[in-house]
Each structure stands twice: as structure tokens, then as C-alpha cells.
Design a protein with these regions (language model features):
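A short helix->beta-strand "capping" segment at the edge of beta-propeller domains
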Residues: 26-43, 73-80
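Beta-strand-rich domains and repeat architectures in extracellular enzymes and scaffolds
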Residues: 35-67, 83-95, 245-247
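Surface-exposed loop and turn segments in beta-propeller and other repeat-based domains
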Residues: 36-38, 79-87, 163-172, 208-224
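Beta-rich, blade/repeat-based domains predominating
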Residues: 42-53, 86-97, 127-140, 170-184, ...
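Conserved beta-strand positions in repeat-built beta-propeller and related beta-rich domains
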Residues: 58-62, 101-108, 143-147, 188-192, ...
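Short loop/turn segments that connect beta-strands within beta-propeller blades
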Residues: 72-76, 115-119, 155-158, 200-204, ...
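Blade-loop segments of beta-propeller domains
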Residues: 76-113, 121-131
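Hydrophobic, well-structured mid-protein blocks that either form specific transmembrane helices
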Residues: 111-169
């Protein structure tokens, strides 16, 4: 997503949800410790991210050259890539499923399935609404579309089976972006904020909020409004959590640290 498409009223509503409102004592708030810092391609407008077998897989926008990539974690070297065709498509979230890689596009209601090893296109599929992000839980694909809804898809037919509505203190959470399945929960970036929400996949209730304010040093920030936090990857074998952002020069392995439950959101 790019900022110019967000109406002023919608942006104001999003900021209002995360501004100056204390989180309920029932909703834990987490800060972070940086475990390790890795390089990240500053030209990569990150839309999707996952970790698999020692490598990072990343999808990037915007127009006219969206890509899917396989990258070396330690060096950020692009080992393999494929441009999204035609160039009028805006690439969005990606996820692995068995021997395939599945990709969404933003507003064209078209998704793609590739061979995971070669990035050879295998087929297209369609869905209603926008496509923002994908993850999976070993038996379903999980999709966000920029609304408070999280959709669950049959991984073979790629058709929706059910959905949940994500709420924080009873209020719907808009602009859910990049997703990752972590320890039985859905982690989701909230677009244009410094926050990741931990979502109960059965009820949609936010079980915790991760505040990543200050993660990228000011000296590394581009100053471009939409170069924001976006991108979550998880290495389940070693319990490593990675985060980055659009056109960020760094990718971080972080450890969550519980903060006071009375912490307030202070904007994004």
C-alpha cells in the first residue's frame, strides 16, 4: 500500500484508535530487545516476508516493478527473484505452502501460485476485495485485506472458508497489514503505526500489543511518510522473530519484553 491512497478521514480514524488511549489492563503491551541486526535492501518496499530453511523470502512493491525474492539473511543478497507481470500489478503478501509460493496483489483481485524452488508461475486465482498479506498455520492460509477482517483460505482451492473480525478493547482494528503465524497466534502490522498486534485466531480479540517505537534509528530513516514498519518473519525451529520495514536498511531479530499494562499508545 502507498500513502496517497489513504483518505484523510481514514488516516485520522486510524491514528485515533492508537493515540492517547490506554490499553485495557487485560491487554499486555510489549517492548523489545534487539538480538541481532541484519542488512536489508533499502530499495525494497516490503509487502510480504517469511523465513524458510535458512532464507528470507520477500515480496516488494510498488508499481511498476513488484518482485518476489529469495534472500540471504546474513547479507541481504538477492539469490533469486522474479518480477510480477504485467507491471500494472502491485505485488502484496506472500506465503509458502508445501512446494508452492502464493502471492496476492493489491487492488486487482488476482493472486498467483509459483513453484517455490524456481519461481515459475503455475496458476492464478481470484478473490474479492483487496489483498494485503498472507501467512499460514500448517492447514490454512490466513489473509488480510486492509480491513478488520482476517480471512482463512483453503490452501488447495484458495477459497475462503471463514473469517474473523479483529478487535482491541471491543473496537475493530483497521489497516491490518503484514501477517505472521507465531506460536498459535497471528501477528499483524498495523499500517502507518509502530505497532504489531497479537491476534487470537479463533475470536479475533487482540491478545497483546507490541510497541516497536524507536526500532529503526533516526539516522537510518528516509523521511518518506510511507517508509513504515512492515514485515514479520518467524523461524519456528529456533524461535527467532524478525521485523523490518518498507525501504528500511536494516532487518532486526527481536525479543519481546513485557511492559506495564497501563502503557498508552502514542501514535505511529
Amino acid at each position: 500500500m502507498i500513502l496517497r491512497t489513504l483518505p484523510a478521514a481514514a488516516l485520522a480514524a486510524l491514528i485515533a484508535l492508537f493515540a492517547a488511549a490506554p490499553v485495557s489492563a487485560a491487554v499486555p503491551v510489549y517492548g523489545y530487545q534487539i538480538v541481532h541486526t541484519y542488512p536489508h535492501d533499502r530499495k525494497a518496499f516490503t509487502e510480504g516476508l517469511f523465513y524458510l530453511n535458512g532464507y528470507l523470502y520477500e515480496s516488494t512493491g510498488p508499481y511498476p516493478r513488484s518482485q518476489i525474492r529469495k534472500e540471504d539473511l546474513a547479507t541481504a543478497k538477492v539469490l533469486q527473484s522474479r518480477d510480477l507481470a504485467p507491471s500494472s500489478l502491485f505485488g502484496e503478501g506472500i506465503v509458502n505452502w508445501k512446494t508452492h509460493l502464493v502471492q496476492l496483489t493489491w487492488q486487482t483481485q488476482i493472486g498467483f501460485v509459483y513453484d517455490l524452488a524456481t519461481f515459475k508461475p503455475l496458476k492464478r486465482f481470484t478473490y474479492p476485495g483487496e489483498g494485503w498479506a498472507l501467512t499460514q498455520n500448517d492447514h490454512e492460509l490466513v489473509m488480510s485485506d486492509g480491513t478488520p477482517a482476517i480471512r482463512f483460505l483453503n490452501p488447495d482451492s484458495l477459497k475462503e472458508t471463514h473469517r474473523i473480525t479483529v478487535t482491541l478493547d471491543g473496537r475493530p482494528v483497521e489497516r491490518l497489514n503484514e501477517l505472521e503465524w507465531v506460536r498459535g497466534e497471528i501477528l499483524a502490522n498495523v499500517w502507518m503505526t509502530n505497532y504489531i498486534v497479537r491476534i487470537n485466531p479463533t475470536t479475533g480479540v487482540v491478545a497483546g500489543v507490541i510497541d516497536l517505537t524507536g526500532l529503526l534509528p533516526a539516522s537510518d530513516q528516509s523521511g518518506v511518510t510511507d517508509d513504515v514498519l512492515n514485515g514479520i518473519a518467524y523461524d519456528a525451529k529456533t524461535d527467532r522473530l524478525f521485523v523490518t520495514g518498507k525501504r528500511w536498511p536494516k532487518l532486526f531479530e527481536i525479543r519481546l519484553v513485557k511492559k506495564s499494562q497501563t502503557a498508552s499508545f502514542t501514535g505511529g
